Design a protein with these regions (language model features):
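The feature represents the first ordered module of a protein
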Residues: 39-93
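Cysteine/selenocysteine-centered motifs that mediate thiol-based redox chemistry or coordinate metal-sulfur cofactors
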Residues: 141-172
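Low-complexity, flexible helical/coil segments
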Residues: 74-78, 119-121, 139-143, 150-154
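Well-ordered beta-strand positions
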Residues: 31-34, 57, 106-107
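Short small/polar-residue motifs
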Residues: 22-30, 62-68, 102-103
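Conserved, surface-exposed functional patches that form binding/active-site neighborhoods
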Residues: 77-129
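Compact, glycine/acidic-enriched structural inserts
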Residues: 1-7, 113-114, 121-123, 128-143
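Charge-rich, low-complexity N-terminal segments
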Residues: 1-53
Length: 172
C-alpha cells in the first residue's frame, strides 16, 4: 500500500516543450502533438527502469494512456498503463494539466484490463483528499473503460478508436 498523498498534478507546457512531473521536476519533451481528442507527448526518461515515456491525455475520457519503454532487465508484461483523473487543456498559455485520481488500469496482452490502487482512492477519499464527486467519477471512468475494452475483445485502443480517439505511437 502506498503512503497517503493528495492527488498528483502534472503540467504539460507545449509552448516551452517541457513536462513538469508531480514532484516538480521539469523535463524536456521531444514531441508534443495535439489531436481533436487530446494531447500526445513523447519524452526521454532519466529513470532506472524505463528510458522513454509516451502518453496521450484524453480529457473526454478522463484518461492518460501511456507506454513505458522499459530498460533491459526491467521489462514488464504490460502494454499500456492508464491513469484515471482530470485532464484539461490547453489553457490560455497553451499548457495542459493532469490531476491523477489514484485509480490505474493495466493493459496486458491477451487479458482484460486490471484495476489497481483502489485502496489509495478509498484512503484519499476517507482522508478528505479527494471529494466524493471526483472519487465517484474515478470509479465511473474505470468502469466505462473496462467495459469498453471488454466489448472490443479486451482491446482498449480499439474501443478508444471506435469512440473517436485513434491513438498513434512512436515507431521506436
Amino acid at each position: 500500500m502506498a503512503a497517503l498523498h493528495p492527488p498528483k498534478h502534472e503540467t504539460f507546457d507545449v509552448p516551452a516543450g517541457t513536462n513538469t512531473d508531480p514532484k516538480g521536476f521539469v523535463r524536456q519533451v521531444e514531441t508534443y502533438r495535439t489531436a481533436d481528442f487530446g494531447l500526445y507527448m513523447d519524452r526521454s526518461a532519466d529513470h532506472k527502469e524505463f528510458s522513454r515515456l509516451e502518453s496521450w491525455l484524453l480529457p473526454d475520457f478522463g484518461l492518460r494512456v501511456s507506454i513505458f519503454h522499459y530498460r533491459a532487465g526491467h521489462e514488464r508484461d504490460q502494454h499500456l498503463y492508464l491513469d484515471i483523473g482530470e485532464f484539461t487543456g490547453p489553457d490560455n498559455d497553451g499548457r495542459w494539466h493532469a490531476e491523477d485520481w489514484y485509480l490505474d488500469l493495466i493493459d496486458r496482452p491477451g487479458r482484460g484490463l486490471e484495476l489497481e490502487d483502489v485502496d489509495e482512492l478509498l484512503d484519499a477519499h476517507a482522508a478528505w483528499l479527494l471529494p466524493v464527486d471526483r472519487a465517484e467519477a474515478a470509479v465511473h471512468i474505470a468502469t466505462r473503460t473496462m467495459v469498453g475494452a471488454a466489448s472490443h475483445g479486451n482491446d482498449v485502443q480499439a474501443w478508444l478508436a471506435a469512440e473517436g480517439a485513434e491513438l498513434t505511437w512512436s515507431p521506436r
